[in-house]
From Swiss-Prot:
The keyword Nucleotidyltransferase applies. This is 2-C-methyl-D-erythritol 4-phosphate cytidylyltransferase. Belongs to the IspD/TarI cytidylyltransferase family. IspD subfamily. One of its GO terms (molecular function) is 2-C-methyl-D-erythritol 4-phosphate cytidylyltransferase activity. It comes from Salmonella agona (strain SL483). It comes from the Bacteria. One of its GO terms (biological process) is isopentenyl diphosphate biosynthetic process, methylerythritol 4-phosphate pathway.
Length: 236
């Protein structure tokens, strides 16, 4: 059955290895409590009633995913990921060819709040381009001298935002922009950058700064703290 605007599919690129975590286990399979980071990230998406399907792109030879309860979840589809994030996202988009709108969410971003997700999804009612969750920059920003550990100058932080996920776009538009950007050799660091490359200006939807991505070892304890606090607040 074709998806409608009321239904949203999500793509989670989970084929990375996360070398900065300094662990043999890919970071998305590290545990916080009784769930892996990947499970926390996916369950946050499925908690919203509009999200009816999640496509997870995993690396070839990944033997860990099959051991998770997610592997047997009726709303989960698994595809082979690629060498780069954009390749994995495109593989996921191919699996939801009939979807009108698609979320893309980091596999290692487990602290997504439902109110943030709801605000992001609401933009589909009046946007043809989509948007991303983002957090305004609060710290003083410095640009370094190329190749040196020295300050070149201070960067004006007004209008600077940290790009977060999920990012939310019309499926066909995202597919076309990613394909064009890759074919033309553009540097794609997130899905929004592919749309920017093609001349579009996605919306910035302010989200919570504690929607962190687990990238370094110290992030794991911080994510555990945020998740534990959220669970306690929901039970209160």
């Amino acid at each position: 059955m074709a998806a409608t605007l009321l239904d949203v599919c999500a793509v989670v690129p989970a084929a990375g290895f996360g070398r900065r975590m300094q662990t043999e286990c890919p970071k998305q399979y590290l545990s916080i409590g009784n769930k892996t980071i990947l499970e926390h990230s996916v369950h946050a998406l499925l908690a919203h009633p509009r999200v009816t399907r999640v496509v997870i792109a995993i690396s070839l030879g990944d033997h860990r995913f099959a051991q998770l309860p997610l592997a047997n979840h009726p709303q989960i589809t698994v595809v082979d990921g690629g060498n780069e994030r954009a390749d994995s996202v495109l593989a996921g988009l191919q699996a939801v060819a009939k979807a009108q709108w698609v979320l893309v969410h980091d596999a290692a971003r487990p602290c997504l709040h439902q109110d943030d997700l709801a605000r992001l999804l609401a933009i589909s009612e009046n946007s043809r381009v989509g948007g991303i969750l983002a957090s305004p920059v609060r710290d003083t920003m410095k640009r370094g001298e190329p190749g040196k550990n020295a300050i070149a100058h201070t960067v004006e932080r007004a209008d600077l935002w940290h790009a977060l996920t999920p990012q939310f776009f019309p499926r066909e538009l995202l597919h076309d922009c990613l394909t064009r950007a890759l074919n033309e050799g553009a540097t794609i660091t997130d899905e929004a950058s592919a749309l920017e490359y093609c001349g579009f200006h996605p919306a910035l939807v302010e989200g919570r700064a504690d929607n962190i991505k687990v990238t370094r070892p110290e992030d794991l304890a911080l994510a555990e703290f945020y998740l534990t606090r959220t669970i306690h607040q929901e039970k209160a």
